[in-house]
């Protein structure tokens, strides 16, 4: 895992852009952007509880981790959202992850977090961010699947080959039913060995 020591500057590559809206792949997240990310995570906490608030430690752990796919969305140079993909194997401390049939195969990217600032919801930004994320997940060597936990009923709105693996009551203490889904990123088996 990469560590940031007194690095305030974020290093990114713009991977999609339209006018004042940019989507950036993070190479190294600097401390200057931590506050924005913690503020945005508050909208997750409103829906699911305070454990969904980002901290400096969780930001460093997930945004600056080797193997992760951290992507941010900016509007007029301000961060308005983020999505983080993690190989299942980097989440081995989570009891549920070892039950996934692909655990240990290094072929699955788990969507750890996906959030857009409340003011920017229902304006198409989240949809574009997710499309770019899926596109980049497909480009990661050896990755054939994308998984994640979403509220019950959400995954049926997804495009592509989606399979619900499990339903979990009271996911992570939220009091809500969540689905664990798997998206096949390579249904034509173009990239499979």
Regions found by a protein language model. Give the residues of each.
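Short amphipathic alpha-helix that is part of the acyltransferase structural core
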Residues: 5-58, 70-75, 79-80
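A short helix-loop-beta-strand connector motif used in the catalytic cores of GNAT acetyltransferases and
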Residues: 60-72, 86-92, 110
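Conserved acyl-donor/pantetheine-binding loop and adjacent beta-alpha core of acyl/acetyltransferases
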Residues: 79, 83-113
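Conserved acetyl-CoA-binding loop-helix of GNAT-fold acetyltransferases
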Residues: 113-116, 122-135
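Conserved catalytic-core motifs of GNAT/GCN5-like acyltransferases
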Residues: 147-150, 161-180
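Short, charged/polar "capping" segments at the starts of alpha-helices
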Residues: 153-158
């Amino acid at each position: 895992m990469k560590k940031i020591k007194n690095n305030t500057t974020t290093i990114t590559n713009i991977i999609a852009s339209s006018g004042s809206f940019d989507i950036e792949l993070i190479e190294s997240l600097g401390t200057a952007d931590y506050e924005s990310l913690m503020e945005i995570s508050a909208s997750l906490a409103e829906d699911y509880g305070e454990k969904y608030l980002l901290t400096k430690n969780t930001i460093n752990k997930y945004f600056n981790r080797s193997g992760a796919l951290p992507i941010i969305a900016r509007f007029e140079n301000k961060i308005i959202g983020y999505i983080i993909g993690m190989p299942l194997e980097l989440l081995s401390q989570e009891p549920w992850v070892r039950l996934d049939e692909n655990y240990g195969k290094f072929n699955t990217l788990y969507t750890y977090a996906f959030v857009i600032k409340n003011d920017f919801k229902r304006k198409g930004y989240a949809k574009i961010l997710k499309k770019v994320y899926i596109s980049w997940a497909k480009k990661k060597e050896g990755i054939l699947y994308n998984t994640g936990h979403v509220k019950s009923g959400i995954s049926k709105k997804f495009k592509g080959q989606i399979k619900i693996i499990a339903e979990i009551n009271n996911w992570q203490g939220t009091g809500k039913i969540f689905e664990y889904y798997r998206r096949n990123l390579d249904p034509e088996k173009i990239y499979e060995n």
